[in-house]
């Protein structure tokens, strides 16, 4: 189906369609299994141009009972991807809740995973339309894949899996699909700068300039979730000042992000170890914005323990 072709309306369309895509090695199979466990009917590697026809067939086959469907596509369908975004827009105009999740990871993490599994990258022996004997290095294949999927990434909710175990990824995917569709969901994420800035961050705040509970013996083994750490940080004037300024920025600009038709806005707060200050800030911000709509909390370093 070309970009200019619009499929006819789907009779008795599914209630929810989740598209899972992303960089090879980033965890698409794990995410799809998580959706299957959550009650979605899942299809892997469906050619994008067949999505509207597939949904019609499933609705007819199940008498309209198939209400939650997840479809995974990858770079092997690159030549058909231009037709995918118009198809998703068409579904949305028909009242279907459409979510697109794009899994990504750092090149370093991807190279390590391919090395551990000894699998070949799908573009290492040629991109779609290239001769099959055109070999390329793994890092070159990863960068080419990023280029081919750039438009789809821009239109999706991005999830950085670089530091995630499979169990963490499954839990995070379940959280994403449980959040209300159609409204902006705020994601507050703590992280350690020494492990890199999350790839899925929209806004990044650095709280390393604030007093560090790590240097107080009785607070060192605790986290920003614990009352003694929270009490200590609340007593520091600069902590309250920075927290208030971040809150004020979000209050001022959230309406603009909502008008931009974003599904998610990820606010990443970083400190040295991702244990005290960033965790405290995330917990406080999530509490302050909970009444404004859906909020999700993720502590990258703590969740990895």
Curated annotation (Swiss-Prot):
ATP binds at residues 22-29. Keywords: ATP-binding, GTP-binding, Nucleotide-binding. GO terms for molecular function: ATP binding; GTP binding. Transmembrane segments: none annotated. GTP binds at residues 74-77. InterPro entries: P-loop_NTPase (IPR027417), RapZ-like (IPR005337), RapZ-like_N (IPR053930), RapZ_C (IPR053931). Belongs to the RapZ-like family. HAMAP family: RapZ_like. Displays ATPase and GTPase activities. This is Nucleotide-binding protein Mpe_A3336.
């Amino acid at each position: 189906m070309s970009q200019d072709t619009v499929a006819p309306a789907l009779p008795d369309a599914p209630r929810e369609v989740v598209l899972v895509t992303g960089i090879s090695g980033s965890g698409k199979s794990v995410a799809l299994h998580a959706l299957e466990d959550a009650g979605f009917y899942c299809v892997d590697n469906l050619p994008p141009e067949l999505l509207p026809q597939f949904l019609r067939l499933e609705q007819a086959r199940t008498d309209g009972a198939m209400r939650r469907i997840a479809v995974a596509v990858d770079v092997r369908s690159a030549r058909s991807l231009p037709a995918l975004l118009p198809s998703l827009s068409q579904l949305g105009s028909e009242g279907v809740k459409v979510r697109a999740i794009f899994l990504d990871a750092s090149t370093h993490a991807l190279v390590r995973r391919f090395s551990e599994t000894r699998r070949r990258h799908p573009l290492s022996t040629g991109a779609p339309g290239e001769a099959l004997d055109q070999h390329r290095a793994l890092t070159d294949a990863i960068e080419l894949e990023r280029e081919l999927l750039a438009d789809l990434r821009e239109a999706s909710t991005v999830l950085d899996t670089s530091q995630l175990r499979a169990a963490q990824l499954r839990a995070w995917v379940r959280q994403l699909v449980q959040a209300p569709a159609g409204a902006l969901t705020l994601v507050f994420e703590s992280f350690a700068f020494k492990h890199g800035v999350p790839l899925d961050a929209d806004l990044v705040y650095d709280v390393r300039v604030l007093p560090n509970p790590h240097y107080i013996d009785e607070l060192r083994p605790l986290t920003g979730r614990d009352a003694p750490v929270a009490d200590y940080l609340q007593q520091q004037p600069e902590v309250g000042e920075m927290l208030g300024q971040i809150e004020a920025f979000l209050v001022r600009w959230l309406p603009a992000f909502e008008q931009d038709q974003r599904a998610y806005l990820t606010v990443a707060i970083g400190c040295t170890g991702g244990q005290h200050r960033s965790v405290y800030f995330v917990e406080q911000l999530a509490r302050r914005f909970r009444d404004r709509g859906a909020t999700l909390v993720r502590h990258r370093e703590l969740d990895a323990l």
